[in-house]
Structures are given as structure tokens and as C-alpha cells.
């Protein structure tokens, strides 16, 4: 994926020394994951926020996967960013096969990893043609399972089910993303702080949500 090489070139050109803790949301999580496999010596911690998962395709299976790709192609909109009108967009699933090949040959090395997953269901069109026949009851457990599988990529990864957030967890509950990043950075600097964690993202005096929640039935 070209954007991974571009990010690497940008960090080098900007003289930002590694190694890095990467944080990525949605497709940005895919970029972070592929960066870590492409440049394994440069990444020592990651936070993936409701990220595109390498497990989506096998979990959705041969019947559902093409429907998911078509659904996202029809529903995705690109919001222009001032000054970046010519920026390229990444078609959904365009790098999936390459990603799974890369991650299979270059697994994620052990590191502090925090995985955040949305809890509020996506708003699906009521028109079955537009939704590709998906319902929240069908799709949400699969998305949850794909997110949860990311927390099994390395030993001692932390998983958090953000029940009060939609896909944009960093906007709906920004403190969760901030705390996850803080915990990963602290874990890189002092590994004992990571292994001693009893929860991801929540501070010691705030346990209103259960970090080990099983989420939707699946």
C-alpha cells in the first residue's frame, strides 16, 4: 500500500526519529498495522481505534464479504479537507489481500497494543438494496469479532468495548483514545506498567464500563 511507504518517507523527511507508537482509526488502523509489518523495527507500540481488521474477510466469509464491500462502496462519502482537495482516497478493501499476505509473512512482534471497538451500532439503510441485506443484528457481532481478534495478535494486548461510542470513538469518547495512547506510551517506557494494567483506557478511578465485556453474542 503506497500510503505506508509515504508515511515512512514523511517521517524520514521530517526528521522524526523512531521507534514509534502508532495510533490509527478505521483505515488509519490498517495503515498502522501494515506499517508495523513493513518496518517492524520502527514500531514499538500501537493503538487501533475501531480499525479495519485483517480478520474481516475470513470472519464475514465468502457470501457476506462481497456484500460488505459493495455496501461500503455505495455508502462511503469523502469529506473534503481544506488544502487537500486532490488527496487520494482509499477504496474499501482495496488493500485487503495485500494486507493479509503481508501480515501473514511478517506477524506483529510483541509490543503494547490497545484495541478499541465501537459499541453503538452503525446506522444501516432500511432499504435492503442499499444495505446489501445486512441488519444490525447480523453485522454487529461480526464486526465485534473482527475487532476482538486484533487483540490476539500479541500477548498481553488490551481490548476495550466502547459501548457509548459509534465508529468515531475518538470523537464520541475522546478520553478513551487519549488514555489508551497514554497507557501504551507508558508501557513502552516502563513495561511493568503495561503488564500490571487491569483495564484498558479507563483511569484507576473510573470503571464505569467493563473492559472485558463480551459484546454482542456471536
Per-range role (PLM):
Residues 8, 33-37, 178:
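Short, hydrophobic alpha-helix immediately C-terminal to the catalytic nucleophile
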Residues 2-18:
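Conserved acidic catalytic loop of the alpha/beta-hydrolase fold
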Residues 155-218:
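Catalytic active-site module of serine/aspartate enzymes centered on a nucleophile-bearing elbow/loop
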Residues 84-105, 140-149:
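Active-site nucleophile elbow and catalytic-triad environment of alpha/beta-hydrolase enzymes
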Residues 47-91, 95, 130:
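Flexible "cap/lid" loop of the alpha/beta hydrolase fold
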Residues 123, 127-165:
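Conserved loop-alpha-helix segment in the C-terminal half of the alpha/beta-hydrolase fold
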Residues 17-60:
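Conserved hydrolase catalytic core segment
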Residues 115-117:
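Short beta-strand/loop motif that positions the catalytic acidic residue
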Amino acid at each position: 500500500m503506497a500510503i505506508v511507504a509515504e508515511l515512512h518517507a514523511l517521517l524520514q523527511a521530517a526528521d522524526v526519529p523512531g521507534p514509534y507508537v502508532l495510533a490509527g482509526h478505521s483505515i488509519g488502523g490498517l495503515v498502522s498495522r501494515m506499517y508495523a509489518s513493513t518496518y517492524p523495527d520502527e514500531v514499538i507500540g500501537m493503538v487501533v481505534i475501531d480499525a479495519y481488521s485483517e480478520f474481516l474477510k475470513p470472519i464475514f466469509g465468502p457470501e457476506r464479504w462481497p456484500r460488505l464491500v459493495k455496501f461500503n462502496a455505495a455508502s462511503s462519502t469523502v469529506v473534503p479537507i481544506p488544502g487537500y482537495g486532490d488527496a487520494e482516497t482509499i477504496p474499501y478493501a482495496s488493500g485487503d489481500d495485500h494486507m493479509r499476505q503481508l501480515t501473514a509473512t511478517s506477524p506483529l512482534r510483541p509490543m503494547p497494543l490497545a484495541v478499541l471497538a465501537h459499541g453503538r451500532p452503525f446506522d444501516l439503510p432500511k432499504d435492503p438494496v442499499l444495505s446489501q441485506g445486512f441488519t444490525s443484528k447480523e453485522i454487529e457481532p461480526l464486526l465485534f469479532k473482527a475487532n476482538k481478534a486484533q487483540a490476539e495478535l500479541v500477548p498481553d494486548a488490551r481490548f476495550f468495548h466502547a459501548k457509548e461510542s459509534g465508529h468515531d470513538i475518538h470523537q464520541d469518547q475522546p478520553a478513551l483514545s487519549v488514555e489508551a495512547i497514554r497507557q501504551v506510551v507508558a508501557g513502552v517506557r516502563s513495561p511493568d506498567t503495561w503488564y500490571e494494567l487491569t483495564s484498558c483506557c479507563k483511569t484507576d478511578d473510573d470503571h464505569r464500563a467493563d473492559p472485558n465485556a463480551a459484546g454482542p453474542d456471536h
